[in-house]
């Protein structure tokens, strides 16, 4: 009976204080140069928890000897103390390892929280409407607004006609054309049809330059006529610079007399 109790006691001692944690065996197994650092922790600034566990083991052994005949299933206070001690050691080691692996996260933990949670004010608003609606047509009697009509005239000019629509009226009120267009002389080229340059017979030009008597000239012919003041008296041909010395028209053979433009007369 006494031999069985002694065997159980030695087993409990081995479980509570295994031989791998014995300081004397560690000192004997390690060389003398490494003896001061045998019981140190991984980090030198952190206090080791092994002395606390060793004290708990020494205090738990007499208690186990007195309570040998206790219930086998009920945990003893010594095992609870050792369990809490081992938990503390494991938690401390995991904290130190995480700090060593990720030092930036431990220095500024608030940055990760702020970056993970974005405020609602920074959310993008959708460009398109959630419920898109079709615009009202001009024929709809509920339409109220201004309609602009763009028309390109034969003289390459742009005419914009605004139309004001009032609600409840099917008819629309149109403004008259521009005063310059309305007051155009009936004998001008606009009344006869599309404008045509009297010199080169073109109908397209970026800018019309009329002569002093209202004869339509294109941009190039108008600049030459304004600069040199020379044209054919019969067919209105404005000669080019290379034909200036000749006094005969290349189209009809008439003489090209210099005609003073209004700027040259001044």
From Swiss-Prot:
Any Gene Ontology biological process: spermatogenesis
The keyword Transcription belongs to this UniProt entry's keyword annotation: yes
Zinc finger (GATA-type): 197-221
InterPro entries reported in the protein's UniProt record: GATA-type_ZnF_Regulator (IPR053116), Znf_GATA (IPR000679), Znf_NHR/GATA (IPR013088)
Gene3D superfamilies, per database record: Erythroid Transcription Factor GATA-1, subunit A (3.30.50.10)
Chain intervals with Polar residues compositional bias: 106-121
SMART domains xref list: ZnF_GATA
Subcellular location per the Swiss-Prot or TrEMBL entry: Nucleus
Tissue: Specifically expressed in adult testis and ovary. Expressed at high levels in the somatic cells of the developing gonads, including Leydig cells in the testes and granulosa cells in the ovaries.
GO molecular function: DNA-binding transcription factor activity, RNA polymerase II-specific; sequence-specific DNA binding; zinc ion binding
UniProt entry keywords in alphabetical sequence: Activator, Developmental protein, Differentiation, DNA-binding, Metal-binding, Nucleus, Oogenesis, Repressor, Spermatogenesis, Transcription, Transcription regulation, Zinc, Zinc-finger
Source organism superkingdom: Eukaryota
Region described as Disordered: 1-31, 106-129, 171-191
CDD domains recorded: ZnF_GATA
Induction: Up-regulated in response to bone morphogenetic proteins (BMPs) signaling.
Disruption phenotype: Mice are viable and normal; however, both males and females are completely infertile. In females, Zglp1 absence leads to a severe block in germ cell development as early as 17.5 dpc. Ovaries at postnatal day (P) 8 and 6 weeks are highly atrophic with no ovarian follicles. Ovaries as early as 17.5 dpc contain a drastically reduced number of cells expressing Ddx4. In males, Zglp1 absence leads to defective sperm development with a marked reduction in mature spermatids observed as early as postnatal week 1. Male germ cells develop normally until P7.
GO cellular component: nucleus
Any Pfam family hit: GATA
Protein role: Transcriptional regulator that plays a key role in germ cell development. Determines the oogenic fate by activating key genes for the oogenic program and meiotic prophase entry. Acts downstream of bone morphogenetic protein (BMP) by regulating expression of genes required for the oogenic programs, which are repressed by Polycomb activities in sexually uncommitted germ cells. Regulates expression of STRA8, a central downstream effector for the meiotic program. Acts independently of retinoic acid (RA).
Stated name of the protein: GATA-type zinc finger protein 1
Species in which this protein is naturally found: Mus musculus
């Amino acid at each position: 009976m006494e031999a069985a109790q002694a065997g159980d006691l030695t087993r409990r001692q081995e479980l509570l204080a295994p031989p791998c944690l014995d300081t004397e065996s560690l000192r004997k197994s390690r060389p003398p140069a490494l003896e001061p650092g045998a019981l140190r922790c991984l980090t030198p600034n952190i206090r080791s928890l092994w002395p606390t566990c060793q004290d708990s083991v020494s205090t738990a052994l007499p208690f186990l000897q007195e309570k040998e005949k206790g219930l086998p299933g009920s945990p003893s206070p010594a095992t609870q103390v050792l369990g809490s001690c081992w938990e503390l050691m494991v938690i401390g080691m995991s904290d130190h390892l995480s700090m060593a692996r990720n030092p930036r996260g431990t220095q500024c933990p608030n940055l990760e929280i702020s970056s993970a949670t974005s405020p609602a004010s920074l959310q993008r608003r959708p460009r398109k409407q959630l419920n898109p609606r079709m615009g009202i047509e001009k024929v709809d009697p509920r339409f109220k607004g201004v309609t602009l009509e763009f028309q390109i005239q034969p003289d390459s000019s742009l005419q914009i006609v605004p139309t004001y629509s009032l609600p409840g009226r099917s008819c629309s009120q149109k403004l008259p054309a521009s005063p310059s267009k309305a007051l155009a002389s009936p004998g001008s080229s606009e009344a006869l049809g599309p404008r045509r340059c009297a010199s080169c017979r073109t109908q397209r030009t970026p800018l019309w330059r009329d002569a002093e008597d209202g004869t339509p000239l294109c941009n190039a012919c108008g600049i030459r006529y304004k600069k040199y003041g020379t044209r054919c008296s019969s067919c209105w041909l404005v000669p080019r610079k290379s034909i200036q010395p000749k006094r005969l028209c290349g189209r009809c053979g008439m003489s090209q007399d210099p005609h003073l433009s209004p700027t040259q007369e001044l």
